[in-house]
Structure formats: C-alpha cells, structure tokens
Amino acid sequence: RQRQMCIRDRQRTGEEHYLELLKDNYPLVRSIRRFSEMDYSHALRVSEISGECAGKLGLKENLCRAAGFYYRIGRMEGEPYTENGVLLAQNACFPEELIQILREYNGELMAISTKESAIVHMVDKVVTKLDLLDKETFSTTWNQDMVIYQTLNENSATGIYDESGLSMNQFLTIRDFLVKGDHLFDSNNRE
C-alpha cells in the first residue's frame, strides 16, 4: 500500500504539488531547518530565485522552487551528497522530474538535462558564491555584478548546460535578471 501511494505521489507533477513540498510543516522542510539554519536560509533563497528565473522564461516555476529548495538535501546525510539526496527524495516520494534535477546536482553524476535543472544549478552556484564572500567585497554593486557574471560565465564555459536545451538567449536572460535583481541578493540575507 505504501509503495502504491509513493508511485502515485511520484506521478503527481502539478505545480500545486510542488508548493505542498515547500510548506513550513512539510517533514523534510522541518528536517533541513533542524539540520542547519544556514542551509535552510540558502535553500529558501535558491528556491525563490529559481522560481523567479523560471518565470522569466515561461518554465515550471514551482518545480524550480522545489528543486532549488531541495538541491543540496544530500548534505543532511553526508557524502556522497548526490546519491544521498536522491535517496531522501525517493523515500519522500517526490515526483520523478524533481528527483531528476536532484540526480543532476552540480552535474556530478549526470549531465544537466533540462532548462529547469540548468536554472537551479545557475542560481545555486551564484548564491553559494555570494554567501562565501563577505559584505566588504560587495561595497559596490559593481563587485556583486562582476561575481555573478564571472560565476555564470565560468560554469557555462565548461559546457555544463550544453545538454539542457537552454539557449544562449535564455542563458543571457537569466544572467541579466540575476545581475539586475539587486533585491534578490540583498546583503541582509547574508550573515
């Protein structure tokens, strides 16, 4: 019976189902928050920004929000992060298209294969980089803009998005949105 329920849940891919996975009272949301307030904060930012980026391209916003939130879930179990993240998602009966994005975490095991996966990867890389740098570094918006350009251009140059179907125009649209979206990377979010 549990297996049948899990199969049914994995087949649910409606945008409203993804919102259920992001509610404060959802067990894995609570687990991430208990695991690390820093990881929880990071997950919230990646989730929100990924959804905004998907909206700019007319893609699945709530899938990107859910994937952004759970992208680093494997950290709760330790290495190997990707495999552990996929196992947690499978045990929670996440929809297959969400599990696929988690399976493509950082392009480590599998190439990034969808536009939504590329967006989540791009946003996670930028948020991670901005988290690592101190507030002094961002005394001007120019510095923040340069970090975003450099991070995304370096990742793109590796070919990591080549199999995602993301066009150069779409990549540039997302990059420009991230650069111009000062409110998305409010320095008050970084500690």
Please place each PLM-identified region on the residue numbering:
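Short, small-residue-biased leader/transition segments that mark boundaries at the very start
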Residues: 2-7
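Membrane-interfacial segments at transmembrane helix termini in multi-pass membrane proteins
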Residues: 8-31
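Acidic-enriched, low-complexity/disordered segments with a strong bias for Aspartate over Glutamate
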Residues: 9, 24, 39, 124, ...
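Divalent metal-dependent catalytic cores for phosphoryl transfer on phosphate-bearing substrates
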Residues: 27-155
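Long, hydrophobic alpha-helical segments that serve as membrane-spanning/inserting helices
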Residues: 138-141, 146, 150-191
